[in-house]
Swiss-Prot record:
Protein name per the record: Nucleolar protein 9
Subcellular location, record wording: Nucleus, Nucleolus
Gene behind the chain: nop9
Native source species: Aspergillus flavus (strain ATCC 200026 / FGSC A1120 / IAM 13836 / NRRL 3357 / JCM 12722 / SRRC 167)
Signal peptide: none
Gene3D superfamilies for this protein: Leucine-rich Repeat Variant
Length: 707
């Protein structure tokens, strides 16, 4: 009798159960299935779960509201409040308004103000929808940046009561950040309506009343809304940057998002592209401000609440957390710089909990923690902040017992090297001399691996502290080719980039929008910065660059001038105080017969502009260059950068009033307002001798009278 065709075993049973479950899911109607948001794949939120990684417990904070899931991307859509969607007509209107603001073709500021008022009227009642909209949230950011304080005051009032949800939203969190930054200057002001504004309000029916709360009180309301959730918001991917801005605003510290070393916003943050000078407050956000007294007490309470819900282990784990680390940097800098370095003595302070032992003895818990931060790409940024702000006594212990003996190996490391830079900035003359002697033998290997930041900072600090740079100059000379022309190509990475471009063009065709590799661009930038720093040092270090520039042919100089990164070196060499008249007399004529080509180039035009002050004391060369520019007047006037060169060289004055142009070219009208010719050295000596003789004559007359 044949056996039944039956599969046996554990794997077969598991497969049968999966098939049954799959059939059940297919039979369920699609509408009854809960919809879930797509998980985020942002690389910035991925955490390397190594041996030193401690995950944050979801239920760690007892005060944390359980309705907010740690990963908002994986949470059901119903967990976050839904403020509604804009109608297609509304989306089209706000998209066109965004385009109008980007074009910025308003006749004057009054026309722009009227347009912004009309957009606010159209957005009345839809502010939360716009802030949470992917396409229109950028418009909200631009509106806030271009609004006056009264409009910001009203918008802030609309957001009150919703900040806990908005700061966690992918798009609305950026609107909150922009709102905090632009509202910060008004916390000490009382928003008063002018008579014209009051008349407009009386004429228009249905005008919304002015908010009863001041901006300072509104910031306190925001803190009250977020209270009890600080421990969770520290590591929330969207709320983190908004919390940083809020802390800095409460402290009255500068909130400069555009700075390269800013911890306020991510480097991937999209720029709004606002025209220069179109914001209401200009660069107020980059300045320190006075704040109400209640802000300082509120800030202290926030910092206390943040660290009270975390024990020492989790606080140190936050130091290597990619989202929580920038917030910790802000907290440490505020604790040490805003409240004073004496606050670090408090055993409950953040700094003391991170670094309890200031002696940094080998094998201690503090030394192990600091060593882990040194080589961690995320943690090293916190260590930079600690080194920059920590008290002098603690810094001396860190340097003498931990960093001094291994500063050479730390400088070679690509991550720890940045901490070494912060250490060099705080060293005194004797310690800097000792560090220079240790690092100088490693300079050739550092430059070979494109680690140019350490030699650059060494030069800067030696100039500040008055340390002899001759050993560093010899090390730099040994690191590069003996041929001066080749030396400059190696420093600026011109030779390597040319070879890379040739190899890439042979291997694969480039698209029209293909960009150069990030590594080569970074190397060129650091090489240019190193060369510019070398030019500021008097003596043999700057001589290495000057001799290399004189060894270049005119064609290679034109090529360097048209390079956006390398052209900065030429501008510096023409205008820096170490540039002698003898060098400029030999160097400036190399650009003649190439001025048209350079003036029409976006980078080369800046070199032509630098030739104007560089030839102040060699008038015959400047006059020859002006004649060459005159021959290509039409080509220069047809170009945007060419018109800038024509204006900076005062060529209209050259054509019409040659005598006045000559006085301006020699720098005579810049020395004094009367337009008098500056005295020569022999004339100054004669005047000094005459004044001394007159003084002696007066003294002799006085003696005769007394006798």
């Amino acid at each position: 009798m044949p056996r039944e065709n039956q599969k046996r075993g554990r794997r077969a049973a598991e497969k049968a159960e999966k098939d049954a479950a799959k059939r059940k899911r297919e039979e369920v109607p699609e509408d009854s299935l809960p919809k879930r948001l797509k998980p985020s794949t942002d690389e910035s939120t991925e955490i390397n779960q190594g041996a030193d990684y401690i995950p944050f417990d979801e239920n760690y904070n007892e005060n944390y509201d359980g309705n907010y899931d740690e990963n908002q991307a994986d949470a059901p859509a119903g967990d976050m409040p839904f403020y509604g969607l804009l109608d297609p007509e509304e989306q089209e209107y706000f998209s066109r308004a965004n385009e109008v603001l980007e074009l910025n073709q308003f006749q004057d500021a009054e026309e722009r103000r009227i347009f912004i008022d009309s957009v606010y009227k159209e957005a009345n009642g839809k502010e939360l929808k716009i802030a949470c909209s992917q396409g229109c949230s950028r418009l909200m950011e631009k509106l806030i940046s271009m609004s006056d304080m009264r409009q910001i005051h009203r918008l802030f009032n609309k957001f009150i009561g919703h900040f806990m949800n908005l700061v966690q939203h992918r798009f609305a969190s950026h609107c909150c950040e922009t709102l905090f930054i632009n509202a910060a200057p008004g916390v000490t002001q009382k928003v008063s309506k002018s008579k014209s504004d009051k008349m407009d309000v009386d004429e228009e029916e249905g005008e919304e009343p002015e908010p009863e709360l001041s901006l300072a009180e509104m910031f306190i309301k925001v803190v009250e809304e977020l209270e009890g959730n600080w421990g969770y918001l520290l590591t929330e991917r969207f709320a983190s940057h908004t919390i940083r801005v809020l802390l800095l605003v409460l402290a009255g510290e500068p909130v400069d998002v555009s700075a390269n070393d800013s911890v306020v916003a991510s480097r991937k943050k999209e720029k709004l592209g606002l025209p220069q000078g179109e914001t209401q407050d200009g660069d107020v956000s980059a300045q320190k401000r006075s704040v109400p007294d209640v802000f300082e007490a509120t800030l202290k309470k926030i910092m206390k609440d943040i660290v009270s819900v975390l024990d020492d282990t989790y606080l140190r784990a936050l130091a290597t957390h990619p989202v929580g680390n920038p917030v910790l940097q802000v907290l440490v800098s505020l604790e040490l710089s805003h409240f004073g370095k004496s606050s670090a003595k408090d055993p409950n302070s953040i700094t003391r909990r991170l670094i309890p032992d200031e002696s940094f003895e080998e094998g201690s818990e503090t030394t192990t923690f600091v060593r882990g931060l040194l080589y961690d790409p995320v943690g090293s940024r916190l260590l930079e902040t600690i080194v920059r702000c920590m008290p002098g006594k603690a810094f001396k212990g860190l340097y003498k017992n931990f960093i001094r003996d291994q500063i050479t190996s730390l400088a070679r490391n690509i991550t720890a090297g940045y901490v070494v830079l912060r250490v060099l900035e705080r060293l005194g003359k004797d310690d800097l001399q000792n560090a220079l002697e240790r690092i100088v033998p490693q300079v050739p290997s550092l430059l070979e691996r494109s680690r140019m930041v350490v030699p650059k900072v060494l030069i800067e600090r030696c100039l500040v502290r008055g340390v002899d740079t001759a050993p560093l100059a010899r090390a730099l000379e040994e690191a590069y080719d003996k041929d001066p022309a080749r030396r400059l190509e190696q420093i600026l990475r011109l030779e390597s980039t040319t070879q890379e471009d040739l190899e890439e063009s042979e291997q694969k065709p480039k698209g029209p929008n293909a960009a150069p590799s990030q590594s080569s661009t970074g190397e060129k930038l650091h090489g240019s910065l190193l060369a510019q720093t070398m030019l500021t040092a008097p003596g043999p270090i700057s001589g290495l660059i000057y001799s290399s520039l004189l060894a270049q042919s005119s064609e290679s100089l034109v090529k360097i001038a048209k390079d956006p990164t390398a052209s900065r070196v030429l501008q510096q060499a023409l205008t820096v105080p170490t540039s002698s008249a003898q060098f400029r007399r030999q160097f400036a004529p190399r650009f003649t017969s190439h001025l048209k080509e350079l003036a029409l180039d976006s980078s080369g035009s800046h070199v032509v502009d630098a030739l104007w002050p560089a030839t102040k004391d060699i008038f015959f060369i400047k006059e020859r260059m002006a004649q060459e520019l005159t021959q290509h007047e039409m080509a220069l006037r047809d170009s945007f950068v060419g018109r800038a060169v024509w204006r900076n060289w005062a060529m209209d004055l050259y054509k019409r009033r040659r005598g006045e142009w000559a006085m301006k070219a020699k720098g005579i009208d810049n020395n004094n307002g009367s337009g008098e010719r500056p005295k020569s050295r022999i004339e100054l000596a004669r005047a000094k001798f005459a004044a001394k003789a007159e003084e002696d004559a007066k003294k002799g007359a006085q003696k005769g009278v007394t006798a």
